[in-house]
């Protein structure tokens, strides 16, 4: 379940991050930790996301969060790169990782399989397209529960 502050945080973070030429990939608020952890994953579409990218976003976002006071009490702000085990959600993700190996989970099973692996060829409103050992496979979006970059 998404924390109710996530949309507000995304609205605050997105213009800051985009001004630096970066993308917001995901925002997670871990309230089960003490103090709670607000993690913002960013990506540099032009090159590898650097420590400097994370530091710049951290400073700028921290100032705005403190100024707006939308965060309840003490919290830890973490800015990071999503890494290789990340899930693909947005159209931008599917474009950026075309040709990469992905794992797709389906429920209910599609063609008697719950797990699919192959090279991502694309996505449209109907299906995610994979290349599995030279064979093209279209997995309907309606049965897909997650698409994740393969290890």
UniProtKB/Swiss-Prot annotation:
Gene3D superfamilies: Ribosome maturation factor RimP, C-terminal domain, RimP-like superfamily, N-terminal. Keywords: Cytoplasm, Ribosome biogenesis. Its main location: cytoplasm. It is found in: Cytoplasm. GO terms for biological process: ribosomal small subunit assembly; translation. GO terms for cellular component: cytosol. It comes from the Bacteria. InterPro entries: Ribosome_maturation_RimP, RimP_C, RimP_C_sf, RimP_N, RimP_N_sf. PANTHER family: RIBOSOME MATURATION FACTOR RIMP. Required for maturation of 30S ribosomal subunits. Belongs to the RimP family. This is Ribosome maturation factor RimP. The gene is rimP.
């Amino acid at each position: 379940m998404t924390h109710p502050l996530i949309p507000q945080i995304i609205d605050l973070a997105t213009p800051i991050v985009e001004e630096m030429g970066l993308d917001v990939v995901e925002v997670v608020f871990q309230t089960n930790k003490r103090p709670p952890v607000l993690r913002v994953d960013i990506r540099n579409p032009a090159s590898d996301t650097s420590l400097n990218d994370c530091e710049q976003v951290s400073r700028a976002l921290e100032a705005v969060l403190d100024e707006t006071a939308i965060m309840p009490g003490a919290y830890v702000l973490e800015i990071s790169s999503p890494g290789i085990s990340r899930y693909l959600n947005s159209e931008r993700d599917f474009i950026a990782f075309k040709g990469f190996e992905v794992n797709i989970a389906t429920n209910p099973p599609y063609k008697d399989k719950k797990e699919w692996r192959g090279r991502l060829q694309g996505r449209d409103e109907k299906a995610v397209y994979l290349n599995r050992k030279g064979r093209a496979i279209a997995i309907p979006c309606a049965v897909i529960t997650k698409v994740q970059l393969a290890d």
